[in-house]
């Protein structure tokens, strides 16, 4: 199986080539998310779309917590691989497996019983509450599948392998679309069918990744790691990354609650825009994953010169990419939104107008989001999860402040720029923090 040593070679070429499969994988992931939404909205109507939309941030929180934990748990693997220490890599992989299982069980035990109350707190409209709760229950039960895939994909990325997760995501996407058609349109399972299709697709992707991880025979542990330090180190990185995503999602839920006050059609427009949000940040997320691996391996090898050069180049690449995507979405935004909102549905014109207003506000400020991902992931790869968590806290504060204050003065239009304010709050923390760390790499290395 292919592994990639990112401590040697041209920095920008390594990062870009590593991120390309991730980008394609994210495109396929967004494809099956989009297909979910299109099938649900076209076959079940605007209210079904709104039911998914009002639970978007709640379901994202569970998935993002699991993803954050998996990514944090895998950072020590990248460090160990950068130093070419096989024994250390084996212990890190063994520790990740145990931590992944335990953390998912604890997460479900805490959150699952609270889901109905959270949806009530979000002011979910009564006419879509049952469907929203059913969909959320399925997604949360499926977090075991989500962790299964993300833990294995994170291990592969730590070894510099971004192609296998791409192949896994292609398989998952194709299966998800087929299962959507079968469960939602064929068997008439309704909104639950869309959730079940997603969970099964994650399981298949995880099995594919597991097959390829097992090919790393010299790195596969033969026993469970019993050194408590390894468990502490992974949780030291994984928990702050998970909490960072919790803070972001809480802010998103506050925003959703504010959106819910303005009715189902405003919510449907917001939901359609949110589905395109994933498309907006595909490249940003991919560059981010690449930087976690790149900075992680070079940090383990003490190649601080390569870290400085790589971050500088990926920031410029991110800005150029974001400007190009902004132009495309500004021009073709109405067409993309029309994929989610059927013109024959009740309230379709209103929903389209609201969705377009949200989308255009985000596209203007998209470079800020790309800077956020570039700097946050670089800092995480440097074995510092605290600063990204603090940036998540500032995102939360900005989202809550914007969602509560701006509508007082501007009505529903005040909700359009709230997401942008959250990005600004995070960047204010991340950018100066990274350059402070860059000036003190040797001290940071000794501390971490």
Feature roles, as predicted:
Residues 6-44, 60-72, 76, 101-108, ...:
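N-terminal transmembrane alpha-helices
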Residues 1-19, 77-142, 188-239, 295-364, ...:
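Short alpha-helical transmembrane segments in multi-pass integral membrane proteins
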Residues 24, 28, 32, 62, ...:
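Residue-level hotspots within pore-lining transmembrane alpha-helices
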Residues 70, 139-157, 165-173, 194-207, ...:
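Short runs within selected transmembrane alpha-helices of multi-pass transporters and secretion channels
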Residues 22, 26, 38, 75, ...:
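Transmembrane alpha-helix boundary and packing residues in multipass membrane permease domains
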């Amino acid at each position: 199986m292919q592994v990639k040593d990112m401590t040697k070679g041209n920095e920008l070429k390594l990062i870009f080539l590593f991120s390309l499969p991730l980008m394609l994988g994210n495109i396929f992931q967004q494809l099956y998310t989009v297909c979910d939404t299109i099938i649900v909205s076209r076959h079940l109507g605007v209210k079904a779309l709104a039911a998914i939309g009002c639970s978007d941030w709640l379901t994202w929180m569970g998935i993002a917590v699991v993803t954050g934990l998996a990514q944090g748990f895998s950072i020590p693997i990248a460090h160990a691989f950068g130093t070419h220490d096989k024994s250390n890599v084996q212990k890190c992989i063994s520790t990740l497996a145990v931590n992944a299982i335990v953390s998912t069980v604890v997460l479900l035990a805490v959150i699952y019983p609270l889901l109905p109350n959270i949806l009530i707190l979000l002011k979910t409209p009564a006419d879509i509450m049952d469907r929203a709760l059913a969909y959320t229950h399925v997604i949360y039960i499926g977090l075991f599948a989500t962790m299964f895939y993300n833990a294995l994909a994170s291990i592969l990325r730590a070894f510099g392998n971004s192609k296998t997760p791409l192949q896994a995501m292609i398989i998952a996407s194709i299966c998800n679309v087929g299962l959507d058609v079968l469960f939602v349109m064929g068997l008439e399972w309704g909104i639950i069918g869309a959730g079940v299709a997603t969970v099964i697709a994650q399981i298949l992707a995880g099995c594919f990744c597991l097959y390829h991880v097992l090919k790393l025979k010299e790195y596969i542990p033969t026993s469970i790691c019993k050194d408590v330090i390894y468990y502490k180190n992974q949780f030291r990185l994984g928990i702050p990354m998970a909490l960072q995503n919790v803070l972001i999602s809480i802010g998103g839920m506050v925003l959703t609650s504010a959106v819910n006050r303005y009715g189902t059609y405003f919510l449907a427009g917001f939901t359609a825009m949110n589905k395109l949000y994933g498309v907006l940040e595909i490249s940003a997320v991919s560059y981010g994953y690449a930087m976690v691996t790149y900075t992680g391996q070079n940090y383990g090898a003490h190649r601080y010169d390569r870290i400085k050069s790589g971050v500088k180049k990926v920031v410029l690449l991110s800005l150029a990419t974001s400007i190009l995507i902004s132009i495309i979405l500004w021009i073709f935004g109405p067409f993309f939104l029309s994929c989610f909102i059927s013109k024959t549905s009740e309230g379709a014109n209103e929903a389209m107008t609201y969705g377009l207003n949200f989308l255009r506000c985000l596209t203007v400020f998209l470079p800020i989001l790309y800077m956020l991902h570039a700097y946050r992931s670089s800092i995480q790869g440097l074995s510092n999860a605290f600063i990204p968590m603090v940036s998540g806290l500032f995102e939360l504060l900005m989202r809550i402040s914007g969602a509560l204050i701006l509508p007082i003065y501007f009505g529903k239009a005040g909700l359009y720029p709230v997401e942008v304010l959250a990005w600004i709050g995070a960047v204010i923390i991340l950018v100066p923090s990274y350059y402070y760390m860059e000036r003190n790499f040797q001290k940071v290395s000794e501390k971490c």
